[in-house]
């Protein structure tokens, strides 16, 4: 109800400053009786995916709550699941500012944040305090200064630390803002990483006596051949799910608009069609062998339904949430 007024004020500010101010307020009310200020009631729409029970199929995508500081306040808005992160083994400040830009006319965002986060240990401490009743995903990545050849070690360190606290673990190999990261999506590098992750998952299952599914997050900027190879690798290594997609480097839909020349990943409405097409092609290739979590430009109920019609079992929002607020959650969950 109040979001249009709040949004108008926030959109006068630098995007990252607006984010910081919003999270400052959410941190203040999280785990307090004042959570009622953001709480909204949504119907239960149970979904089973990756062996987990979701109270509804709508989640918050990774990147908004990188350090898991506002899980309960965000959960109160009605998300069926929340994905925190991307988190890395060691804290890192990310890329130089400014690094987040609004493409207002297109309801898009461009970011080159660079995995800024307080490190996996800090995230785990925050996760331990949460009372969120939905599924919690933890998205993990590699530190910028870790050579790509040793990148898998960073994922294994993070897995070791988050496993006991995660509903599922998301492997981010598709951010365009960490040099060389996307190369892990291809060929031997991908097979090597997935083998190491599955071995670690088996080891941690024995140690903790519980199975935590692993999903891999992929880019939208993939050729037909690359997509076929990725699908084949995911199936061969028995990965539990795939998150499609991350942000795009493509700018054709925002040519001539403010900030269109900024480097970084583009999200929001300009990503909607291409991410849905990747989901459709991926769904055909996977033929039901593993589930797809659809994300990219969902800004309405219709956009969410399109992702599910293309083959997604669950969907996530981020940019659409920034532009439309908590009402978008209620609209999607109520009518999906």
From Swiss-Prot:
Its main location: membrane. It is a peripheral membrane protein. GO terms for cellular component: cytoplasm; plasma membrane. GO terms for biological process: 'de novo' pyrimidine nucleobase biosynthetic process; 'de novo' UMP biosynthetic process. It is an enzyme of class 1 (oxidoreductase). The active site is at 175 (nucleophile). Its EC number is 1.3.5.2. Its cofactor is FMN. Pathway: Pyrimidine metabolism; UMP biosynthesis via de novo pathway; orotate from (S)-dihydroorotate (quinone route): step 1/1. It catalyses: (S)-dihydroorotate + a quinone = orotate + a quinol. SUPFAM superfamilies: FMN-linked oxidoreductases. FMN binds at residues 62-66, 86, 139, 172, 217, 245, 268, 297, 318-319. Substrate binds at residues 66, 111-115, 172, 177, 246-247. NCBIfam families: PRK05286.1-1, PRK05286.1-2, PRK05286.1-4, PRK05286.2-5, pyrD_sub2. PANTHER family: DIHYDROOROTATE DEHYDROGENASE (QUINONE), MITOCHONDRIAL, DIHYDROOROTATE DEHYDROGENASE (QUINONE), MITOCHONDRIAL-RELATED. This is Dihydroorotate dehydrogenase (quinone).
């Amino acid at each position: 109800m109040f979001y249009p007024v709040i949004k108008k004020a926030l959109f006068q500010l630098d995007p990252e400053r607006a984010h910081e101010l919003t999270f400052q307020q959410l941190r203040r009310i999280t785990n307090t009786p004042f959570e009622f200020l953001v709480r909204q009631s949504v119907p239960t729409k149970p979904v089973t995916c990756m062996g987990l029970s979701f109270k509804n199929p709508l989640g918050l995508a990774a990147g908004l709550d990188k350090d898991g500081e506002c899980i309960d306040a965000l959960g109160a808005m009605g998300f069926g699941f929340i994905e925190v992160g991307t988190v890395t083994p060691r804290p890192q400040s990310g890329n130089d500012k400014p690094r987040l830009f609004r493409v207002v006319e297109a309801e898009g965002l461009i970011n080159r944040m660079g995995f800024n986060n307080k490190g996996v240990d800090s995230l785990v401490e925050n996760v331990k305090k949460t009372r969120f009743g939905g599924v919690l995903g933890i998205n993990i990545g590699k530190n910028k200064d870790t050579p790509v050849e040793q990148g898998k070690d960073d994922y294994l360190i993070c897995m070791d630390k988050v496993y006991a606290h995660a509903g599922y673990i998301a492997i981010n190999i598709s951010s365009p803002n960490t040099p060389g990261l996307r190369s892990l999506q291809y060929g031997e590098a991908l097979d090597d990483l997935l083998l190491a992750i599955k071995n670690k998952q088996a080891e941690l299952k024995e140690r903790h006596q519980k199975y935590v599914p692993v999903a891999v997050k992929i880019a939208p900027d993939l050729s037909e051949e690359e997509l076929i190879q990725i699908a084949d690798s995911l199936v061969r290594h028995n990965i539990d799910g795939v998150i499609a997609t991350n942000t795009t480097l493509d700018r054709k839909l925002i040519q001539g608009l403010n900030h269109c020349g900024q480097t970084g990943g583009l999200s929001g409405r300009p990503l909607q069609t291409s991410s849905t097409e990747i989901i459709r092609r991926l769904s055909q290739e996977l033929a039901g062998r593993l589930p797809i979590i659809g994300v990219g430009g969902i800004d309405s109920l219709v956009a969410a339904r399109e992702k599910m019609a293309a083959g997604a079992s669950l969907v996530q929002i981020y940019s659409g949430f920034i532009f439309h607020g908590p009402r978008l959650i209620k609209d999607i969950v109520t009518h999906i």
